[in-house]
């Protein structure tokens, strides 16, 4: 257990560093390009290689590769398997690169048909010719990360993504004044090279860097089939991003950037709280008999964290966007639309967070069918309602958070209804979380009437969180009391040990 905890801690630390530098990367793009035709074009062109990066990073490749690799190690076929899978990845990535280089205009037209008559289209076509070259780099990153994880190397693979962001930021800052918008495309490639350097060094050091072998024998065919099947579930979330890009291309210039900037912020509490909770829950319910108790606790804890996060994003949307992005070429109009989107996206945070917990219940029972169906249902609903809101009701860019709210709540109901054993809904706790969050929102509103400085208001977030937590204790909410008891008890123990 200590080794598991240490490995999880190291991996989480690497991911946290990557998140921090990821936001610095976005802020740098916003500084130089704001929400413009150039930024829209870049986010469109980077969508394809970035989708593969996220699929690989979220475990789509690891989920298949690691069991096969582990079996090959046991049978002393490690080198042969590594050579064949390396060859497969090279073939796959280079095939996609060739298609991207031969048909860039057609690909951009399919992804974002609404920009064909706009200046954005020519920029996107130019960018794609560069960004598609990132795919072999990210494929090698996924391959090397999977090998190193099996070898017990956790921190370096997780921190490699940070090096991508760091390389991207430095390249953009250094090259912008010389190359202009082309600095964005080159920053992706330089960041990709930064990303694979530490993994390559470790593979070479451990003598695990093999010469690729191009083979399509029975083992590789089985591996490929399982990978493509697994890819379906992991790619559904990325398909949702393509749907958003497709629909946003029909709106005013800058809309794709508005959606991107806002989504990056509202997804943060979901990834920090619910994903980490769901991973922990999966480990617990897979080994313990008292699964219902752990699931109930996870649901309460998810609500306890996601509801105030939702309130905070709603009340502080303008201030948060201002602190993160409002500088350089990020205009007042960009701030208006991005913060407006964020305030609406905030309502979806609890629904998406709870989805992760319920999906974990299915995974613990080895049921991948329902979570996969729910992911594609989510894409369908977002596409349906997004189209209705944009083309029939003319809601413009605000169509996306409204469609996300309907989709996320509907999918949550679907996941709950399909549970073989219903988990109890903690209505009593829910009411307390809503009351405490409302009073926290009142405190935010009060401080906003005293100062309009966004940096001061955002710096008060820990105070708002503490106020919410204390209010829960006043309401006698059991989880808050247990947490406070644990903190107080640990403090007493440490005090006795120091004496």
Curated annotation (Swiss-Prot):
Membership in a protein family: Belongs to the MurJ/MviN family.
Native source species: Aquifex aeolicus (strain VF5)
Name recorded for this polypeptide: Probable lipid II flippase MurJ
Annotated membrane topology: Multi-pass membrane protein
GO biological process terms on file: cell wall organization; lipid translocation; lipid-linked peptidoglycan transport; peptidoglycan biosynthetic process; regulation of cell shape
Principal subcellular localization: membrane
Domain of life the protein comes from: Bacteria
Matches recorded under CDD domains: MATE_MurJ_like (cd13123)
Sequence intervals crossing the membrane: 4-24, 26-46, 88-108, 130-150, 154-174, 184-204, 227-247, 265-285, 297-317, 335-355, 375-395, 396-416, 425-445, 455-475
């Amino acid at each position: 257990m200590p080794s598991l905890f240490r490995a999880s801690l190291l991996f989480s630390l690497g991911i946290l560093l990557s998140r921090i530098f990821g936001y610095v990367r976005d802020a740098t793009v916003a500084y130089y390009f704001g929400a413009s035709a150039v930024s829209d074009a870049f986010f469109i062109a980077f969508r394809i290689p970035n989708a593969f990066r996220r699929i690989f990073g979220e475990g789509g490749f690891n989920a298949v590769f690691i069991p096969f690799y582990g079996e090959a190690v046991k049978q002393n076929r490690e080198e042969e398997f590594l050579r064949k899978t390396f060859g497969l990845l090279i073939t796959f990535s280079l095939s996609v690169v060739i298609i991207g280089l031969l048909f860039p205009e057609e690909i951009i037209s399919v992804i974002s048909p609404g920009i064909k008559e706009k200046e954005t289209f020519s920029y996107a076509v130019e960018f794609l010719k560069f960004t598609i070259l990132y795919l072999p780099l990210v494929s090698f990153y996924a391959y090397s990360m999977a090998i190193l994880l099996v070898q017990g190397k956790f921190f370096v693979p997780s921190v490699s993504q940070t090096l991508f962001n760091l390389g991207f930021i430095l390249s953009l800052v250094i090259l912008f004044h010389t190359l202009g918008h082309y600095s964005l495309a080159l920053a992706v490639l330089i960041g990709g090279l930064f990303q694979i350097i530490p993994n390559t060094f470790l593979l070479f050091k451990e003598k695990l860097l093999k010469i690729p072998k191009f083979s399509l024998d029975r083992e590789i065919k089985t591996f490929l089939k399982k990978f493509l099947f697994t890819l379906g579930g992991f790619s559904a979330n990325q398909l949702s991003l393509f749907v958003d890009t497709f629909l946003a291309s029909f709106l005013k210039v800058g809309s794709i950037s508005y959606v991107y900037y806002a989504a990056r912020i509202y997804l943060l509490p979901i990834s920090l709280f619910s994903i980490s909770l769901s991973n922990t829950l999966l480990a617990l319910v897979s080994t313990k008999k008292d699964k219902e108790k752990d699931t109930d606790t996870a649901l309460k804890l998810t609500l306890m964290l996601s509801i105030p996060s939702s309130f905070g994003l709603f009340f502080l949307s303008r201030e948060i966007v201002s602190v993160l992005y409002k500088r350089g070429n990020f205009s007042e109009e960009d701030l208006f639309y991005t913060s407006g989107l964020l305030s609406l996206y905030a309502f979806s945070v609890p629904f998406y967070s709870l989805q992760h917990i319920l999906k974990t219940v299915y995974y613990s029972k080895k049921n991948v069918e329902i979570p996969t169906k729910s992911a594609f249902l989510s894409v369908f609903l977002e596409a349906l309602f997004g189209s209705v809101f944009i083309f029939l009701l003319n809601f413009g860019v605000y169509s996306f958070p409204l469609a996300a709210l309907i989709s996320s709540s509907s999918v949550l109901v679907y996941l709950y209804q399909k549970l073989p054993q219903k988990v109890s809904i903690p209505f009593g706790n829910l009411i307390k979380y809503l009351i405490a969050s409302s009073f926290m929102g009142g405190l935010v509103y009060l401080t906003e009437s005293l100062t309009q400085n966004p940096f001061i208001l955002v710096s008060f977030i820990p105070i708002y969180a503490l106020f919410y937590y204390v209010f829960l204790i006043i309401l006698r909410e059991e989880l808050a009391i247990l947490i406070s008891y644990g903190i107080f008890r640990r403090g007493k123990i440490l005090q006795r040990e120091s004496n």
